[in-house]
Amino acid sequence: MTDSNLLGLTCWLIDTRTLWPGQHIKDAASDILHLLSNDERNAVLRKIFIADARMSLASALLKRLYISRALNIPWRDVKIARKGDPTHGKPCAVLPDGSFAPIDFNVSHQAGLVSLVGWNPPPGQSQSALVGTDIVCVNERDDYRTIDQEGFDAWIDIYEDVFSEAERWDMKYNVDYITLLDGRIIQGNSLGRVDRCVRRNKDLSITLPTGETHSFNSDLLIDAKLRRFYSFFCYKEAYIKLAGEALLAPWLKELEFQNVKSPKPGTVARCSTHGTWGEKVSDVEVVLHGEKVEDVKMTLQAFEENFMLATAVQGLRDLEAPPFTKLNLENDVVAFAS
């Protein structure tokens, strides 16, 4: 990564899972914390669990790095405020005269990963844009306990305050594909009414149009539905973070996603290899208050086996978000800040 300022869309990712080992971030990151303001540093130190502190620290570093490079100002001169609500509003960069800088950025973190998406209009382009990002981890929570007790349909209804009735029906009874134990992928439209199954540990059987018959455990179907649920969730979070409202948005259930596909996973990091990116999808349809949204472009990218990262860009419909760039803490962040 060079020292030049950033233009256009930027998508960054930093993995904190192996950073700052130990139990206390104050000791583990003593050589890094001085790069933050007092408020930023205190926010990191208030975290009880070091995993949360790592992500909070990485988030603060990414925001400072982006603002410094996008505005071409020294690291120490970066000032961050919030638009609207001083507590829950969307973070923004503040210029020396106290006005908001004409850039937009958003961060997300989950299970050790931290993402940043930013927009800085190129010279001569006055078009403004809003950006949002979100990260989900499919197997981070103990979702199966409730699913095993009450069924996948009842588990989905836990989120009735977040998703519309149509979205919840779609998640319960539709699936885009399942992956058999031998790696073969069966498209959802070949499953027949097997896709109505909402219980784990059931024996299922399908006959494909070719005449092939496949038998499998319903755990594979529920796994696929669960991954698709998190695709819905990731899209919704990224969209509502465009304006910084998050799940407080009063129009949450009026925001619906159609043609949702869960991107096929990458591979998890092994002893001698890094985790790999999986599929990227960008053909989701967004509906708000019953009307199709035309000015927002969304993408969903799989990373390793369980992560998915969403981007939302409003105001630049024809501009495709670039691939996420994984940053190295020492080479890309600390070296620049120093």
Curated annotation (Swiss-Prot):
Acyl-carrier-protein synthase that transfers the 4'-phosphopantetheine moiety from coenzyme A to a Ser of an acyl-carrier-protein. The 4'-phosphopantetheine (4'-PPT) portion of CoA provides the essential prosthetic group for a number of carrier proteins and multi-domain enzymes, priming them for the acceptance of acyl building blocks in fatty acid synthesis and many aspects of secondary metabolism mediated by polyketide synthases (PKSs) and non-ribosomal peptide synthetases (NRPSs). Disulfide bonds: none annotated. Induction: Expression is regulated by the cAMP-PKA and HOG1 signaling pathways via the transcriptional activator MSN2. Pfam families: AASDHPPT_N. This is 4'-phosphopantetheinyl transferase. Its EC number is 2.7.8.7. Disruption phenotype: Completely abolishes the ability to produce any liamocins. GO terms for biological process: lysine biosynthetic process via aminoadipic acid. SUPFAM superfamilies: 4'-phosphopantetheinyl transferase (SSF56214). Keywords: Transferase. It is an enzyme of class 2 (transferase). Liamocins have high bioactivity against the pathogenic bacteria Streptococcus spp. and can be potential new specific inhibitors of oral streptococcal biofilms without affecting normal oral microflora. Liamocins are also able to inhibit human cancer cell lines such as breast cancer cell lines T47D and SK-BR3 or the cervical cancer cell line HeLa. Transmembrane segments: none annotated. It comes from Aureobasidium melanogenum. PANTHER family: L-AMINOADIPATE-SEMIALDEHYDE DEHYDROGENASE-PHOSPHOPANTETHEINYL TRANSFERASE, PHOSPHOPANTETHEINE TRANSFERASE. It catalyses: apo-[ACP] + CoA = holo-[ACP] + adenosine 3',5'-bisphosphate + H(+). GO terms for cellular component: cytosol.
